Each structure stands twice: as structure tokens, then as C-alpha cells.
């Protein structure tokens, strides 16, 4: 967690410093903007049935920006997010999976997630945005054959909360956010509570 938190804090510091530059007319955004993004999803599931470790996957999505004032805006989003239940805290295993043909197959989950974010502009420009809001996810596909169960292991619906920061350039954007699950996603008969957490790092274009 400390490894993931440090880059986010450094990014926030750099973005805030960037936002303190002299105001430029090009910083003024139009009321309506459309965006597309993709990036890395680092997630874990908390519960006695899971190790307190992370795994990596990906997320793809699109959003609409409604810039109501110079400081406040709304950003509805729809994202396709993939997660897996094989987890590791050894970064060398992640490198092996990325570059040397390793795999994660124990429990793959595909979600379609809908978020409603409040954008709060930081500093004199509209470049740096603090993002906060709720999210609802629908489980589209579940592959958990290693658990030897014929029933649904994970619940179909999940509610979560998001918080993060985004740097909005004229055409491109990048950012990071933290997601915490608010509901129990355990769909089995045992009483163990499962809640998800994730760090997301993304880049994209804004039209």
C-alpha cells in the first residue's frame, strides 16, 4: 500500500504546483466535453478467504464532463473493469506476468461500472481536478473454476466510493484514483464478508 500511495502523493504535489501558474485563457473549458480512457487497475478483495495482497488488471471507459462553473463540474462515467482473485505482494511476480508469459486464472471477474463524479478544480486553472463520487458495478462474467463451486461465488451488484485527482490538458488527461467497496460481494453460503479495494491509474483523450 505504501508503494502505491507514494506515487499518488507525489503526483498530487506536482499537479498542485502546476496549477499555481498564471491563469491562461486556454485554461477555460467548454461546458460539455467527451472523454475516453484506459489504464491499470490494481485491486484486492478483503476477507478471511483472501490474502491481503494486490493483483493487476486493466480498465477501459468513457465519460461526459459537464463543467457547470469554473470550479465545479459533473462527470458521469461508464467503465469496463477486469479483476482477478490471484494475488501477490511480490512485484517480481507482476513483472513476470507482464513480460514473461505468466498468467492469472484462478478467478477472473469482468465488471461494467457506472460512476457519478463531482469535479472540483484546484488552483486558478481548470487543469487539476479533485474527483469524488459513488459507483455501481454489475458483474458481467465470473470464472472461478478453481473454487470447485457450481453456484455464483460473487454477488452480481456492488456499490463503491471513488476519490482521486486528474490533470486535464487541452486534449489529453491523466490521473489516479482510489476505489473502496461499500457492499459485501460474497455470494457463497459462508458468513465471511468480502469487500473490494482498488487503485486505478489512467490516461486518455478529452474532446
Predicted regions and their residues:
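Gram-negative (and chloroplast) outer-membrane scaffold detector with strong preference
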Residues: 22-24, 28, 32, 40-42, ...
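Predominantly the C-terminal beta-signal and adjacent terminal strand-loop region
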Residues: 77, 81-88, 156, 160-207
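A charged, solvent-exposed segment within the mature domains of Sec-exported extracytoplasmic proteins
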Residues: 127-129, 138-175
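Outer-membrane beta-barrel translocator domains and adjoining extracellular loop/strand segments
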Residues: 46-51, 86-93, 142-149, 186-191
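Short glycine/proline- and aromatic-enriched beta-strand/turn motifs that initiate or cap beta-hairpins
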Residues: 20-61, 181
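Cleavable N-terminal export/targeting peptides
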Residues: 1-29
Amino acid at each position: 500500500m505504501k508503494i502505491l500511495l507514494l506515487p499518488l502523493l507525489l503526483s498530487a504535489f506536482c499537479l498542485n504546483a502546476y496549477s499555481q501558474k498564471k491563469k491562461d485563457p486556454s485554461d477555460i473549458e467548454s461546458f460539455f466535453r467527451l472523454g475516453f480512457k484506459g489504464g491499470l487497475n490494481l485491486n484486492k478483495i478483503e476477507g478471511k478467504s483472501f490474502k491481503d495482497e494486490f493483483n493487476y488488471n486493466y480498465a477501459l471507459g468513457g465519460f461526459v464532463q459537464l463543467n457547470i462553473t469554473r470550479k465545479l463540474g459533473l462527470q458521469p462515467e461508464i467503465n469496463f473493469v477486469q479483476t482477478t482473485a490471484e494475488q501477490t505482494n511480490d512485484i517480481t511476480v507482476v513483472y513476470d506476468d507482464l513480460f514473461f508469459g505468466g498468467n492469472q486464472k484462478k478467478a477472473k471477474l469482468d465488471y461494467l461500472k457506472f460512476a457519478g463524479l463531482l469535479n472540483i478544480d484546484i488552483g486558478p486553472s481548470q487543469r487539476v481536478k479533485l474527483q469524488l463520487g459513488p459507483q455501481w458495478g454489475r458483474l458481467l462474467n465470473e470464472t472461478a473454476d478453481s473454487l470447485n463451486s457450481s453456484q455464483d461465488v460473487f454477488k452480481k451488484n456492488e456499490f463503491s466510493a471513488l476519490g482521486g485527482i486528474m490533470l486535464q490538458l487541452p486534449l489529453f488527461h491523466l490521473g489516479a484514483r482510489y476505489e473502496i467497496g461499500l457492499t459485501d460481494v460474497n455470494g457463497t453460503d459462508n458468513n465471511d464478508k468480502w469487500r473490494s479495494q482498488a487503485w486505478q491509474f489512467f490516461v486518455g483523450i478529452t474532446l
